[in-house]
């Protein structure tokens, strides 16, 4: 449910990957998946944050609504977005492509590979550091948002996807 009856929020975004990671966690901890309360975050070209308990994905902040990512623009201030679209001269198709594959790190830094961004940071690029740190902060905020849904009663936060291997980001 959203603030406009004509627009619904979709429960899409890396569901197979995050569910598999949650089930792996359950197996490794000798638990039933249905008995786990987890937040699972997919950190790839898009970023999604899921709350999983009772044997299902109970809530999701998808890659359209959540933090910006290597390629996704993520959630944006609505009025600014509408104004930008109106003034840009882009078609709806062009705007959707920009949001899905030319946003995030691509829009700010021209690259979609977090390893390249980390090299930029190692080489002293303060702008790259600002953008990458902002992306990490946005992920942390969305994890907190999902945790608040269950009053913080979470047994683990699981990170998956390529960026999950980054010591800098995680």
Region locations from a protein language model:
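Adenine-nucleotide phosphate-binding core of ATP-dependent small-molecule kinases
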Residues: 97-152
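Short glycine-aspartate micro-motif
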Residues: 38-42
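Short beta-strand scaffold segments in enzyme catalytic cores
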Residues: 47-52
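Short acidic-hydrophobic catalytic motif
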Residues: 55
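Glycine-rich phosphate-binding loop plus the immediately following alpha-helix
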Residues: 7-35, 45, 58-114, 119
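Short helix-loop-beta connector
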Residues: 32-36, 151-154
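Short beta-strand-loop/turn "lid" adjacent to the catalytic site in phosphate-handling enzymes
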Residues: 1-4
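Glycine-rich phosphate-binding loops at beta-strand->alpha-helix junctions
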Residues: 154-170
